[in-house]
């Protein structure tokens, strides 16, 4: 019976891991001893490190988007079907379409999502470029500045050592 590796998350981490696993386990995959499935919320893959440049009108959405399937080796089963529930004890998960998927090995590579509302006043007073729409909004706000200063910060008042999506981005801007 073949082993089933399920990766949840079609971002950079999930995509790279799925492809690397195929490279490492290729003989086992050919012998049908291993199968790899990648589940994602979207059929598209966005190059998120460039969202910083969206804020300066240097890139736009279509330039940063590729079909996820085009980035994956053909041996990977790719499904656009977000996970709604994990059953760790039963080694299975449930998806939005109502499917139940069993696994032998599970990787959760869903990335992180900015939550500026968790810092009082930040959502109202600040912007970020870690998602496409907020980066476009920041570009519009920056284009209206005629004079003054722009303040860039990375702040975690409760947990100062918590990593975030792109640690170097504030330095690059």
Per-range role (PLM):
Residues 2-77, 158-173:
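Beta1-alpha1 glycine-rich phosphate/pyrophosphate-binding loop at the start
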Residues 1-3, 76-169:
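FAD-binding core/adjacent interface of flavoenzyme oxidoreductases
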């Amino acid at each position: 019976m073949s082993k089933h590796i399920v990766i949840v998350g079609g971002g950079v981490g999930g995509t790279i891991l799925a492809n690397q696993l195929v490279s490492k386990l290729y003989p086992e995959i050919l012998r049908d001893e291993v199968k790899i499935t990648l589940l994602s919320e979207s059929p598209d893959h966005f190059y998120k490190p460039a969202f910083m440049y969206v804020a300066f009108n240097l890139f736009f959405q279509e330039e940063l988007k590729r079909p996820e399937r085009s980035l994956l080796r053909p041996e990977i089963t790719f499904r656009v079907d977000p996970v709604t529930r994990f059953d760790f004890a039963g080694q299975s998960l449930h998806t939005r379409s109502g499917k139940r998927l069993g696994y032998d090995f599970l990787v959760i590579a869903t990335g992180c999502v900015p939550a500026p509302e968790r810092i009082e006043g930040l959502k109202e007073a600040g912007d970020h470029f870690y998602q496409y729409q907020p980066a476009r909004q920041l570009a519009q706000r920056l284009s209206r500045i005629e004079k003054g200063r722009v303040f860039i910060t990375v702040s975690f008042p409760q947990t100062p050592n918590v990593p975030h999506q792109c640690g170097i981005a504030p330095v690059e801007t």
